[in-house]
Each structure stands twice: as C-alpha cells, then as structure tokens.
C-alpha cells in the first residue's frame, strides 16, 4: 500500500504539491493523472524519498521508503528509463541492483525473460531503443518481487504489442494482490488498464474514484432512436430539454438523424424519463442509450482550471471531438 498524507512540496515560493492525501490500495491498478506540472512526478519522487517534503509524509506499507533496509524487496519503481549506465549490459545492470538489495541472482534471468529481454541480456544498454529501456526499467522494478510497484509513464516508447503486454502484466500483478500505481498520458490505454484513478491539478487532489465512476459523472447525453423522431423531439423540447439530430460524423453511419434512422441526442433528461414520455405519447423506441464521457473527456473537464499551459477553449473543444471519434 502507498499512503500519501498531507504531502506538501515547496520550491522557493512555488508550491508543487499542496496538502495532498490519497491511498493506493493493493489488488488494483491505480492510475495517477494530472496535467503537465500538476505534481505527479514530484509526488512519486517523494514516495521514493528522493524529495524532502515541507509537510506531510509518503509511506510504503506503513514505512518511509528511505527507512527500508532492502527497499527493492518492498517496492519496485520506474521513474526514468534513461537513468541507467549505457556502458553496462542489461544483465550487469540488474545484477548490480540485485547485489545491493540482497536479491537472489537467479531473479536477474527470471525478470529479463519476463520482460522479453533475455536474448539481448548481454548487449550494452546504450544501444537499446527507448522501448527496450522501458522494459529494462520494468525488469528492475520487478527484480525484488515487491508487493508495491510504481511506474511513471512506462508506456513511452512501446509499440502496440508492448503496450498490450504491459497492460496485461500490470493487471496480472494487481490480481496477485500487489499495489500498482501507474502514471500515463495515454488516456485510452489507461482506461483499459486502471480500475481506480487519482487525479491532481496544481498539486491538489481533484478526484479519487473508480475509473468507471469518474467517466459516469460526466454523462454527455442520451441517444434515442424512434419511429417518429420529429414528434418525439417536439415533445421533449416542450419539457425544456435540449434535442439535436444525430449527425453522421458522430457514428460514421449515413442516413441518421430525424430524416434517417431517428437518432436524437437528448441533454437534460435521463433515459428513464425519456422512455416514460415516449410511452405516454405512444412512440415506439428503437434505442435508448445513455452516453458517458470517455476517461479523456472527463479528465479534460476535471482539470480545465488546473492546466498551466494549454490551448484556448475552441482548440480544447476540437481536441475532445477528435478524441470522441
């Protein structure tokens, strides 16, 4: 378990992390989200004892990381895949880490095989691609067979096969009862990997919730299809809700909308109320689908006021539209 309690990090007059509190529980992959400059990496460094807080604390299984005698046996972490000696081989790098933490040398070969680097174990790290360095960093995190794991942007440099591999790996590790904290900018992938999310902005906690619940908070609308869309739209508008015909660009389908298959996007009324209105009016419904925001859309709405450097409203709206498609 990772516990962050009232953590505050200051650099001169700048408050990078502001009274931040959250818990990363075992048995789940927890996504750690925030705009650039939100304080994610600073928080992770504080968990590893690499930064000294102005106030509060960060604990790993109830202890400060710096107080652990064999830290890699308790917690494995990947913060920077490039922070390795390029002149060493992968095997030598992991062997050095194993010796420093009293880890059985047989674990070196085991983790190299686990991350798919067994065939290049004796190549110098300086010749590795970014994706290979990421795999090596993951191997280092797994070396001590720890119960707690923390990864900062581990998907960088990985190809689609590698991304799928790490998704399956992290979920498997969490399924074994381990604590897994994952930071990533790849929202769609994070939505498939993380069961829980912690969102911060300007160093403060914004959300700490199951992934599905976060997206559900930002329900976009209800998609309704009926045999008489024009009459249904008239009834709905009479009840003060927003109604718009479905556009082909929303689904990639042609012939939609009031003059096609009867698709309407309804805002301001939930699916149950729409169904009751249609029933009373004698209008048969073909589809009634609440549409929640994607994780990326929910994240952008949540952090809109916490972005240090970002595009204007029009550009953000266009970006969300592209993501939604």
Residue spans for each PLM region:
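Hydrophobic C-terminal alpha-helix "anchor/cap" residues
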Residues: 142, 236-237, 278
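Short, flexible cytosolic linker that couples an ABC transmembrane/permease module to its adjacent nucleotide-binding
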Residues: 110, 212-216, 312-314
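Conserved NTP-handling cores and scaffolds of large molecular machines
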Residues: 101, 177, 240, 292, ...
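ABC transporter nucleotide-binding domain
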Residues: 166-266
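C-terminal coupling/interaction segments
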Residues: 267-325
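ABC transporter nucleotide-binding domains
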Residues: 2-4, 9-201, 207
């Amino acid at each position: 378990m990772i516990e962050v309690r009232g953590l505050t990090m200051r650099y001169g007059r700048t408050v990078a992390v502001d009274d931040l509190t959250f818990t990363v529980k075992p048995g789940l992959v927890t996504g750690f989200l925030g705009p650039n400059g939100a304080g994610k990496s600073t928080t992770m460094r504080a968990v590893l004892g690499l930064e000294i807080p102005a106030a509060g604390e960060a604990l790993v299984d109830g202890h400060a990381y710096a107080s652990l005698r064999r830290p890699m046996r308790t917690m494995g972490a990947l913060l920077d895949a490039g922070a390795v000696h390029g002149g060493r081989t992968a095997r030598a790098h992991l062997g050095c880490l194993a010796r420093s933490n009293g880890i059985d040398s047989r674990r070196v070969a085991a983790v190299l095989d686990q991350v798919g680097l067994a065939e290049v174990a004796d190549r110098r790290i300086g010749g590795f691609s970014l994706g290979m360095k990421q795999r090596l960093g993951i191997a280092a995190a797994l070396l001590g067979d720890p119960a707690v794991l923390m990864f900062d942007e581990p998907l960088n440099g990985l190809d689609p096969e590698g991304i799928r591999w790490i998704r399956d790996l992290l979920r498997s590790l969490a399924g074994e009862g381990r604590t897994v904290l994952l930071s990533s900018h790849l929202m769609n992938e994070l939505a498939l990997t993380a069961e829980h999310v912690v969102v911060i902005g300007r160093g403060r906690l914004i959300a700490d919730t199951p992934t599905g619940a976060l997206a559900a908070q930002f329900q976009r609308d209800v998609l309704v299809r009926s045999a008489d869309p024009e009459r249904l739209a008239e009834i709905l508008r009479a009840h003060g809700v927003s109604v718009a015909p479905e556009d082909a660009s929303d689904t990639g389908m042609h012939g939609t909308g009031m003059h096609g298959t009867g698709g309407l996007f309804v805002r301001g009324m939930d699916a149950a109320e729409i169904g009751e209105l249609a029933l009373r009016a004698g209008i048969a419904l073909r589809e009634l689908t609440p549409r929640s925001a994607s994780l990326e859309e929910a994240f952008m709405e949540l952090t809109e006021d916490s972005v240090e450097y970002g595009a204007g409203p029009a550009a953000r709206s266009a970006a969300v539209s592209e993501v939604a498609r």
